Amino acid sequence: MKDEANLTFSHNLESVSSDDGMRFQREKFCPRVERAKKFLGETIAEARVLDIGIGYGSFLNILEQDYGIQNLCGMDPFPKSLEMSKKNTSADLRQGDIDDQEWPFSKPFDLITCFDVVEHLKIPSVFFTRSARYLKPGGLVLVTTPNKTLPYHMRKLPFIGKPDLNPTHINVRVPEYWRRLALGTGYEILDEWMGEHLTHIKFVPPLLSAALDKMGLDPRNIPGLNHFQQSFCLLLRKL
């Protein structure tokens, strides 16, 4: 893949790494880590973690700074991502692609994370089968992908929809597809949720989110409304 195919960098590193930028990143990533922490327990700081598709390195920075995890690795096919992330984390960063027959690591991991990447793959099952090779027995996978439920299709509505303009989103699938894929490639599902941010259409989600916040309600926990959440998230254990 050529570097120019990476559409990740819609912001500069300075804005992402600013106080406001990192506050947004923590709101996005920390709930995911807390769910994984329930299964890793108090040993999370000693966990060996691989993040695939590292972006700006913000998630690795949070694992390092907020959770004290030092045994961190990252893999990304794009040199620009590796270059930018080195300014954000001291993790062991290596160039590699999910589709590669061999990943550039020899020691197995307790946890492999992969956020908003599998929808870019021609054959998404490759991620799950490759990850299994690099996990310790009983190791965990935390994977997220666009939440293709009914509200996702509202992106196409004129005037109020937020269209998905990323041409590399070639495998945006319904949650049941990902459940079957995980179960069929040797994992058990420990947890699943729809999370992060209300999205897909303009105006209504921000107003509704603000109203729910005032009432102390979390839209991620409200059936039906949680379908407006941006991501479908799976926490898996290798069998």
Regions found by a protein language model. Name each.
Residues 1-107, 111, 115, 128, ...:
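Conserved N-terminal segment of class I S-adenosyl-L-methionine
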Residues 115-122:
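Short catalytic micro-motifs in class I SAM-dependent methyltransferases
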Residues 126-137:
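A short glycine-rich, Lys/Arg-flanked "PGG" loop and its adjoining helix->strand segment in the class I
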Residues 139-145:
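Conserved beta-strand signature within the Rossmann-like core of class I S-adenosyl-L-methionine
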Residues 147-169:
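Short, glycine-/aromatic-enriched active-site segment of Class I SAM-dependent methyltransferases
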Residues 165-167, 190-196:
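C-terminal alpha-helical "lid/dimerization" subdomain adjacent to the S-adenosyl-L-methionine
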Residues 170-185:
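Short alpha-helix
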